[in-house]
């Protein structure tokens, strides 16, 4: 079951497609109730990382599919930020096996929330502003937010002491800029291009900032605040991956656009992963040599 805790408020009270609204900024997976395919444009569990996501959107046909998905809502989507690989979350208990997932109430949205529920936990939906209080008071047992840079600012280390990785649920989460189509069309072509270019610049700048700041924040969390950094067990990650595959098969069987998007993303991931084995991965391994 996925539920809202008491006193929670809707994440969005109105859509940018309202003729009186001009644009918005958020994450597409909050819209999966209206558009199941929206999940693909934030992040998929075990999916593309930030570098791959940007490449797929801008050079692999992803942006065109995103535009198609939002067309019926009278919206133009643009990538407007990426925080890089996220942390798996904050927990008030250790996760040593699948048994520890059972009954654990966790703030985790999107497809990952459904995975968590199928694994025996309970996914809870709430805006970021409510995470600290609900985690501190025991309304929830765990929460994912973003990563060390943001999580430290939110004070989440004061509400739970176990900090888990890897971020299986959001390996490369993209934020979106959504623009009313009529409002965008009213701009001259040069200003339209400025908007697109500015959004793309912000998208990359956010990733640069998080890459620079996350480790500094993590060192403070661990060395100053005594946070206990832990890795999720392999059997837990394997189960999450198995459930993710099952849920995606169900989704693409019900929604033809989701099927096309998924196939595009999977083919792109397969191709770039082959090269990454001898490039990105090889460099990481090389740097570990003594």
Write out the residue ranges for each language-model feature.
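Single conserved hydrophobic/aromatic residue that forms the stacking wall/gate
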Residues: 1-16, 20
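N-terminal secretory/targeting leader peptides
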Residues: 14-53, 61-63, 68-290
């Amino acid at each position: 079951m996925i539920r809202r805790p008491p006193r929670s408020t809707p994440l969005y009270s109105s859509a940018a497609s309202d003729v009186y609204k001009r644009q918005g900024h958020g994450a597409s997976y909050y819209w999966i109730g209206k558009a199941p395919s929206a999940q693909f444009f934030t992040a998929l569990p075990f999916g593309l990382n930030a570098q791959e996501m940007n490449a797929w959107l801008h050079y692999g046909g992803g942006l065109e599919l995103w535009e198609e998905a939002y067309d019926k809502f009278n919206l133009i989507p643009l990538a407007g930020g990426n925080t890089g690989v996220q942390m798996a979350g904050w927990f008030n208990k250790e996760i040593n096996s699948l048994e520890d997932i059972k009954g654990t109430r966790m703030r985790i949205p999107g497809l990952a929330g459904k995975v968590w529920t199928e694994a025996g936990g309970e996914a809870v939906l709430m805006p970021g502003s409510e995470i600290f209080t609900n985690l501190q008071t025991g309304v929830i047992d765990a929460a994912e937010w973003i990563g060390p840079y943001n999580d430290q600012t939110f004070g989440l280390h004061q509400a739970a002491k176990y900090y888990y990785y890897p971020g299986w649920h959001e390996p490369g989460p993209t934020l979106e800029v959504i623009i009313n189509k009529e409002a965008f069309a009213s701009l001259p072509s040069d200003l339209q291009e400025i908007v697109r270019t500015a959004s793309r610049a912000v998208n990359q700048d956010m990733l640069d900032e998080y890459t620079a700041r996350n480790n500094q924040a993590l060192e403070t969390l661990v060395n100053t605040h005594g946070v206990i950094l832990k890795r999720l067990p392999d059997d837990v990650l394997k189960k999450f991956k198995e459930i993710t595959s099952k849920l995606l098969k169900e989704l693409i069987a019900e929604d033809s656009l989701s099927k096309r998007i998924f196939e595009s993303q999977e083919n792109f991931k397969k191709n770039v992963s082959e090269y990454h084995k001898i490039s990105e991965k090889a460099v990481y391994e090389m740097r570990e040599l003594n």
